[in-house]
């Protein structure tokens, strides 16, 4: 029986599928798998199930001389050297569609949380308390009738747009390509990035990360935004220059931010933690039972397909 190395615990539904077809070796230590353990694990393995936090570089790929597939448990795959994997004739797959609804739900949840100061209100209620209802007390912003600007109208961005329309929001979007069919379906308008930044009340980042996207939102971009704007990032941390965001918040260039991802993840800068006009969540975009189970099945089936000589779904290289 061929071996699969699983770089961290995954939901049981996928693990059982793997156990039917492979000898399964899984990292069960505390924290993230370290490089030496990963290199040891991929030796003699036909398949590797990697997590978003698993750095699969050339050394790891070279150690996995028998690898046919690296099935990444996540929609992103910038943790893997996919070009080198291609050179070695190793398929790399991801789990794109499984994350769509969960991440879109969280994105809209972050919009509501920061606009209506939900987390801040929860903290107040649990600590000092409040004196009662008052006309000027704890005011936030309404979402209905506002403009949402979506950076990246892929599967997740489109799902965010549909949810935003249910709140009677106007939808702007930007990206490398105009998507006229989706515009008609959703009721969205394509604009360039600068126009989006200048006009949106809520700016959500739902684009995939690549080197060209690094620090797409920096000091110059914050200066374009409305002083009442909110930035929401449930995509990848390095798309936003974190220190520039901190400065924009401190200088009241924008009203607030809600983040599920961070530039130096898992580290979160103390400056962000100290600000009241920021909502922070620990990279839980697709952390639902439904999404994580589906992702588990997708990576398992991809590994099974590869060892059976079939082309797996969702190959990215």
Swiss-Prot record:
- Does this UniProt record's set of keywords contain Phosphoprotein? no
Pfam families tied to this protein: 2-Hacid_dh, 2-Hacid_dh_C
Entry EC no(s): 1.1.1.-
The family note in this entry says: Belongs to the D-isomer specific 2-hydroxyacid dehydrogenase family.
Molecular-function GO terms, alphabetical: NAD binding; oxidoreductase activity, acting on the CH-OH group of donors, NAD or NADP as acceptor
Q: What is this protein called?
A: Putative 2-hydroxyacid dehydrogenase SAB2178
List keywords of the entry alphabetically.
NAD, Oxidoreductase
Q: Where does NAD(+) bind?
A: 155-156, 234-236, 260, 283-286
**Where do the catalytic residues lie?**
236, 265, 283
Family matches, as InterPro entries: D-2-hydroxyacid_DH, D-isomer_2_OHA_DH_cat_dom, D-isomer_DH_NAD-bd, NAD(P)-bd_dom_sf
Which branch of life, at top level?
Bacteria
Organism in which the protein naturally occurs: Staphylococcus aureus (strain bovine RF122 / ET3-1)
Top enzyme class, one word, equals oxidoreductase
Keyword Oxidoreductase part of the UniProt annotation: yes
């Amino acid at each position: 029986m061929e071996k699969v190395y699983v770089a961290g615990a995954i939901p049981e539904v996928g693990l059982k599928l793997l156990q039917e077809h492979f000898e399964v070796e899984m990292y069960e230590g505390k924290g993230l798998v370290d490089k030496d353990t990963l290199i040891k694990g991929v030796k003699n393995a036909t398949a590797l199930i990697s997590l978003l936090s698993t750095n699969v570089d050339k050394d790891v790929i070279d150690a996995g001389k028998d690898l046919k597939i690296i099935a990444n448990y996540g929609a992103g795959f910038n943790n893997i050297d996919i070009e080198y994997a291609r050179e070695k004739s190793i398929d790399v797959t991801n789990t794109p569609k499984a994350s769509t609804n969960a991440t879109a739900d969280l994105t809209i949840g972050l919009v509501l949380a920061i606009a209506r100061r939900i987390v801040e209100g929860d903290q107040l209620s649990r600590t000092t308390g409040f004196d009662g209802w008052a006309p000027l007390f704890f005011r936030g912003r309404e979402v209905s009738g506002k403009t949402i600007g979506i950076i990246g109208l892929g599967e997740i961005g489109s799902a965010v747009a549909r949810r935003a329309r249910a709140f009677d929001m106007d939808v702007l979007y930007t990206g490398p390509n105009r998507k006229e069919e989706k515009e008609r379906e959703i009721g969205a308008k394509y604009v360039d990035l600068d126009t989006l930044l200048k006009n949106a009340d809520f700016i959500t980042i739902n684009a995939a990360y690549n080197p060209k996207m690094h620090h797409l939102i920096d000091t110059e971009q914050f200066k374009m935004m409305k002083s009442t704007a909110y930035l929401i990032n449930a995509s990848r941390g390095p798309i936003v220059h974190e220190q520039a965001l901190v400065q924009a918040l401190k200088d009241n260039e924008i009203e607030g931010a809600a983040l599920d991802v961070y530039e130096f993840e898992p580290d979160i800068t103390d400056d962000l933690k100290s600000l009241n006009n920021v909502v922070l969540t620990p990279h839980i975009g697709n952390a639902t039972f439904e999404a994580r189970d589906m992702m588990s099945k997708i990576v398992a089936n991809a590994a099974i397909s590869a060892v059976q000589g079939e082309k797996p779904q969702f190959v990215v290289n």
